[in-house]
């Protein structure tokens, strides 16, 4: 099972902040007057990963892959259908409501839309201070001080504490959301596309802020995004999801330099690069994403994969460690077989992509 | 293709971010700031609002006048509204009786003034009752969902399918004429519309990320409903409730006109009309004019106020669409 | 994945040098008159477009790029907006002087537009075949049957499989990528000279985005349509454009050929944007990851309270007094490279990777 703790040298024996095993979430589809169940949406279909202290796991995928569902299932905003989720070692799915409430202090979430993630009738200060109020931490005065400190930390002025959300810009609202997530001093913050709705120049500010906070507080992030460049920038490890399953999982550099799964290859090939001198040779995938209600049998990607074989159509490929600490779920990338030249590069750090001028 | 039209909201064209900043950082708050420090007092704020929404100010003034009239009734009338005096029966308006006298010799002015008490008591009573239970039902229905929602909605459907006046009449007839029964009979037809509005707001608010965030920090569902959902449903509710005041006054007048509403001894504009309209409209028109004008102005005032409140509350809600 | 990329030399688009100018916008001003004041959504915008050329207009939200396109097509909501000045010449004819009836003959016929959200831009109760044939019948004298055949032909052109069957389907039965293809088919059905594409791929997944961009480029080359691509994504610009205009606060601040813009920008905003975009390091061979992104401090200004002088001055590292007092003149600093900045000389060579 891919274990982030193995990859990071900083914390060799500590418990991973988040550990997910075979997480599944199936939504029933109800039709008709009697609302009979006619099928399921296999939103998350057996996902496993772990995040170590101070590390960021980037979870990428396109629409319908289930990454947002994973984000919510992992903190029980949605109840998983099955699987195991451990935060700091504790199995949170076995907790009672009261115990879960206390456990929530360890893991918080930031949302994508800066407009709807804040209650429009509460002042910014109230929003940020609410977690403290709910958990009855500190006196009123202490809470005020903590909120002021949080404002300062995320780059807002304490004088803005009494302003309402609509008086802030999108980037500032996102900062309020970050301050709210930090209020309880969690170990893990889940970012559900936290910068996708922001302008490029504001994105950079928020990404920098998140990275600074991580360094300062040794935070762990589960960073969900569809923008590969942003994910590459902020993550330590990256996992790629397709139709409810993780298809590839590796340390960031390894994944981007030598992707092993055809879908990852296709994703990387599709990203437009802001360098007009580099032109793409060809697109590596055609067609549309199948529906998660009726996923294709066997490997979900076989309908669009250039290399699909008969085995791919029948058997679900397991997530295997194809190269050291580089996991892929593809029949064509077996640890033993040597089918693709790209695989040989997986064990060697491709130095050609490293040499570059510093920023 | 659907190109934007003149109905397309600006923030969809220019871009939410700086439209929100433009629309808010200036209009209300900047004007407020420009108005100066004295606006921080409550009177200052009231004057500022009156300047910005003149019609609403008029509406508010009318409502306030009626409330004052109702409250100060004993002090502004010189005659007992129930005292009969056959000698001055059907007297025209004069100095002693500014609105004349009815067929029993009762001073019309004091009857109209005390009628305001009745009307307002019923209107406010019915509105408060209707809002209280409507919110309860709507919130529970929208938040809990499932069979609670299904069952409640069907009951609401049934209630709403009957016209307001007919339903009120049926209830009043069943309960019998009295002040409290009138209040109940008027409150019940109000329930469906309020419950519907609250339920609709609740349903959309329930899915909002800020509600998810509240859950993520461990807030109990009850607290979320009170602290996050309910305050955001207030805007349409206030508009509905204020407009409902006018309807309540009208319905009370209608019920009393039909004899099903507020009985003797409480003076009621509606009953005054029914007592005098058919027989005396030509011989003593003041008996019809004054109560009629009172009803008209009262409803007019509440409608103006309701419209202004909607204008005041809605644009600021737009940023959270 | 080095075998997927190849370096291309920055050859000038030689073939379009001799082509004629098909669209010329001069001094376009579109203002919105709202309670708060005047919103100068587009302020003095000028550019020209040659036949078959690919121009990108890039900027962040609220910079006026979408409104420029809507102004060209005269789709500005009036009230509260109005085109207050300028001219838009299509093949020599000033569109702003046409009557509404004449303008209707131009829209969809000589100039077309595709929008960001294909779901809301397609009529949900009409089949896509019917919508495309409607566009054809409006502008060409053909029977309904012929128009429908043309519609199916267009759907095949945009690579929708089983086009004849799909033509009878409704928008909600198609995926996002398909809908965008359908909208492209509708836009190109009458073979327009100019195609305006307003963020056509922003709402799509990245693999679908790549397909749609490829499609637009392929069709553009085949049909000879000039394309104005409006976007905020610099990657899309780099891949598709020959020339780029950068907008900020309703004004054009820089214009150049694409390679030159990316390698030697002359406006601090452009330079800031380029530095703020995280690049896929492995793909573009640039800076190592986990360094801080270069930020542009501050926020995009509200268009109704624009500062005097250069709109970018409050956020600009090079701003001086002259910047705050007067908007800089639009000058040609290098051949084919125009910029509006008092200090562009200082930026020469100061490109951060």
Model-derived features: where do they sit?
Chain B
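Transmembrane alpha-helices
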Residues: 117-133, 168, 172, 222-254, ...
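Short hydrophobic alpha-helical segments within the ABC transporter permease transmembrane module
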Residues: 111-115, 120, 155, 162, ...
């Amino acid at each position: 099972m891919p274990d982030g703790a193995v990859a990071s040298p900083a914390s060799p024996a500590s418990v991973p902040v988040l550990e997910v095993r075979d997480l599944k979430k199936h939504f029933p589809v109800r039709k008709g007057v009697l609302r009979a169940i006619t099928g399921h949406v296999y939103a998350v279909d057996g996902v496993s990963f772990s995040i170590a202290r101070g590390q960021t796991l980037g979870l990428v995928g396109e629409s319908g892959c289930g990454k947002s569902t994973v984000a919510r299932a992992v903190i029980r905003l949605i109840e998983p259908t099955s699987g195991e989720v451990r935060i700091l070692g504790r199995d949170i799915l076995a907790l009672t409501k009261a115990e879960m409430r206390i456990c929530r202090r360890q893991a918080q979430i930031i949302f994508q839309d800066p407009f709807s993630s804040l209650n429009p009738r509460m002042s910014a200060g109230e929003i940020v201070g609410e977690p403290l109020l709910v958990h009855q931490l500190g006196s009123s005065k202490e809470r005020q001080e903590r909120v002021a400190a949080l404002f300062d930390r995320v780059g807002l002025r304490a004088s803005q504490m009494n302003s309402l959300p609509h008086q802030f810009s999108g980037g500032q609202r996102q900062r309020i959301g970050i301050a709210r997530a930090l209020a309880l001093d969690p170990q893990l913050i889940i970012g559900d596309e936290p910068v996708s709705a922001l302008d490029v120049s504001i994105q950079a500010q928020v990404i920098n802020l998140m990275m600074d906070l991580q360094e300062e507080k040794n935070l762990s992030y589960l960073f969900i995004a569809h923008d590969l460049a942003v994910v590459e920038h902020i993550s330590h490890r990256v996992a790629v999801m397709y139709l409810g399953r993780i298809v590839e999982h590796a340390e960031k550099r390894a994944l981007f330099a030598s992707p092993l799964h055809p879908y990852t290859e296709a994703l990387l090939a599709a990203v437009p690069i802001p360098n007009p001198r580099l032109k793409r040779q060809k697109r590596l995938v055609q067609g549309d994403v199948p529906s998660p209600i009726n996923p294709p049998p066997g490997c979900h990607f076989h309908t669009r994969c250039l290399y699909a074989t008969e085995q791919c159509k029948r058997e679900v490929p397991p997530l295997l460690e194809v190269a050291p600490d580089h996991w892929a779920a593809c029949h064509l990338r077996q640890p033993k077989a040597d089918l693709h030249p790209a695989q040989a590069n997986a064990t060697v750090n491709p130095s050609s992509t490293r040499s570059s001028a510093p920023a | 293709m659907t190109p934007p039209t003149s109905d397309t909201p600006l923030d969809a064209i220019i871009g939410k971010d700086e439209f929100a900043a433009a629309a808010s950082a200036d209009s209300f708050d900047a004007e407020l700031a420009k108005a100066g420090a004295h606006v921080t007092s409550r009177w200052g704020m009231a004057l500022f609002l009156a300047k910005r929404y003149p019609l609403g100010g008029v509406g508010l003034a009318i409502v306030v006048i009626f409330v004052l009239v109702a409250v100060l009734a004993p002090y502004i009338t010189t005659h007992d509204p129930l005292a009969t005096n056959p000698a001055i029966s059907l007297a025209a308006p004069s100095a002693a009786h500014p609105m004349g006298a009815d067929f029993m010799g009762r001073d019309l002015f004091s009857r109209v003034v005390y009628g305001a008490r009745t009307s307002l008591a019923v209107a406010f009573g019915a509105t408060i009752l209707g809002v209280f239970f409507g919110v309860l039902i709507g919130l529970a229905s929208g938040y809990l969902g499932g069979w609670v929602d299904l069952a409640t909605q069907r009951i609401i459907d049934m209630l709403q399918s009957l016209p307001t006046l007919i339903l009120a009449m049926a209830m009043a007839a069943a309960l019998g004429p009295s002040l409290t029964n009138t209040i109940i009979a008027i409150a019940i037809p109000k329930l469906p519309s309020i419950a519907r509005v609250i339920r609709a707001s609740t349903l959309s608010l329930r899915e909002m990320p800020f509600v998810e965030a509240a859950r993520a920090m461990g807030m109990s569902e009850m607290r979320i409903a009170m602290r996050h959902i309910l305050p955001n449903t207030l805007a349409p509710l206030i508009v509905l409730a204020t407009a409902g005041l006018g309807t309540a006054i009208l319905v009370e007048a209608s019920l009393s006109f039909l004899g099903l509403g507020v009985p003797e001894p409480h003076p009621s504009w509606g009953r005054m009309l029914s007592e005098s309209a058919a027989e005396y409209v030509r011989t003593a028109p003041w008996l019809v004019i004054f109560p009629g004008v009172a009803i008209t102005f009262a409803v007019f005032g509440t409608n103006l106020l309701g419209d202004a409140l909607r204008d005041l509350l809605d644009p600021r809600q737009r940023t959270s669409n | 994945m080095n075998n997927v990329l190849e370096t291309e030399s920055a050859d000038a688009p030689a073939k379009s040098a001799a082509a004629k100018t098909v669209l010329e916008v001069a001094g376009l001003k579109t203002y919105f008159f709202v309670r708060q004041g005047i919103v100068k959504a587009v302020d003095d915008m000028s550019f020209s477009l040659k036949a078959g050329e690919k121009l990108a207009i890039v900027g962040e939200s609220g910079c006026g790029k979408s409104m420029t396109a809507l102004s060209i097509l005269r789709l500005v909501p009036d009230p509260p907006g109005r085109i207050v000045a300028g001219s838009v010449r299509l093949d020599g004819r000033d569109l702003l002087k046409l009557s509404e009836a004449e303008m209707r003959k131009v829209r969809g016929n000589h100039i077309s537009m595709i929008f960001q959200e294909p779901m809301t831009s397609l009529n949900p109760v009409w089949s896509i075949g019917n919508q495309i044939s409607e566009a054809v019948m409006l502008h060409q004298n053909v029977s309904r049957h012929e128009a429908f055949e043309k519609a199916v032909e267009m759907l095949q052109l945009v690579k929708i499989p089983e086009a004849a069957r799909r033509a009878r389907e409704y928008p909600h039965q198609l995926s996002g990528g398909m809908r965008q293809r359908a909208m492209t088919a509708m836009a190109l059905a009458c073979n327009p000279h100019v195609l305006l594409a307003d963020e056509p791929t922003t709402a799509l997944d990245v693999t679908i985005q790549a397909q749609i961009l490829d499609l637009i480029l392929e069709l553009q080359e085949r049909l000879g349509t000039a394309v104005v691509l409006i976007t905020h994504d610099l990657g899309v610009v780099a891949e598709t454009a020959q020339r780029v205009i950068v907008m900020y606060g309703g004004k054009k601040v820089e214009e150049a050929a694409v390679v030159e813009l990316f390698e030697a920008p002359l406006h601090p905003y452009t330079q800031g944007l380029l530095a703020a975009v995280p690049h896929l390091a492995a793909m573009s061979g640039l800076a190592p990851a986990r360094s801080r992104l270069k930020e542009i401090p501050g926020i995009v200004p509200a268009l109704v309270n624009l500062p005097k002088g250069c709109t970018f001055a409050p956020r600009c590292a090079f701003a001086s007094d002259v910047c705050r007092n007067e908007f800089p003149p639009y000058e040609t600093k290098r051949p084919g490279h125009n910029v509006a900045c008092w200090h562009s000389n200082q930026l020469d060579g100061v490109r951060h990777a």
